[in-house]
Amino acid sequence: MFLKAYFSSDFTIVDVRNVSEVKEGKIFSNSISIPLAEARDRVNEIPTDKPIVVHCAGGYRSAAASSLIQSKLNGSVKVFDLGDAVKEFQ
C-alpha cells in the first residue's frame, strides 16, 4: 500500500481502460480516466507538471497510449508505460 501511495503522488497517472472497466474499480484512486479510443483528442486534459504513467489492465493499450501521449506532448514531459506491472498494484 505504501508503494501505491508513493507512486500515486509522484506521477500523473492516466488510466486508459474502457469506462466499464473503470466503473468496476480504479487501480489508482487519483488516476485520470481517458479511454484509449479518446486519448488522441483528450491529451490536453493531462497535467504536465509531473512525469506521466499510463496504465490499462494488462499492458497492450497502455503501450499504445503512452506512445501517442509522448508524441502529442512533443517530449515536454516524460511518459512511462506501466505495462503488465500494473498487476502488482491490483
Regions found by a protein language model. Give the residues of each.
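Rhodanese-like catalytic fold shared by cysteine-dependent sulfurtransferases
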Residues: 1-12, 16-90
